[in-house]
Amino acid sequence: EIQVIENRYPSQIAPEYGELYRLVTEGNTSGHGTYQKILEQMDLESYLDYYCANLYFGNSQFDSFSTTLWRRAGEGETGKWHWEFSDATDTLGRNKVSNYSVNTYLCPGVAEDLFLQGLLKNKDFQTAFRQRMREYVEELTKEKAEEYLTPLLETYRVAVAATAERYGLRQTEEGYLADGDTIQEYFASRGEYILRY
């Protein structure tokens, strides 16, 4: 059985997730015993990827209350919560706030996230978090972005222009290619900035 919850507001924490949420936000997470209890209920790799991706991609609209969590419950399952990366509308330099130099840690959704702040009290979590962010920086380089995006942009170029024309949208081929340049510029510079923060 797969349980899925959409976590929307702090006052509406799903009961299934509430135990873990309270343990992290109200407990002494700096202690080894409490942290081990937390790890028994959450998939740490999933959470690190979820958070580091949102931070690295500069998701200025990100907050932990507009995400989806899931877990497999039942016999033979771990029952650990996993986080789903969802809305990426305001990422990769697509608006003035989410440019490559944005300190996403200061965005309200991150700075006010009690779950993250609770986990950051634990040294082991801090180490794992830093390590995962370094992996993102090493993996998501300008060269890899160009290698992936250049053929992708070319593949969709004609379709995007035709769709824009068909529906009377303002998107031009030049604008489409400029958006691709913005994304490549983002990857060229983001690693330098995210590690400073």
Regions found by a protein language model. Give the residues of each.
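Conserved ATP-binding subdomain of kinase catalytic cores across diverse folds
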Residues: 1-11
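Middle-to-C-terminal accessory/interaction subdomains
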Residues: 9-197
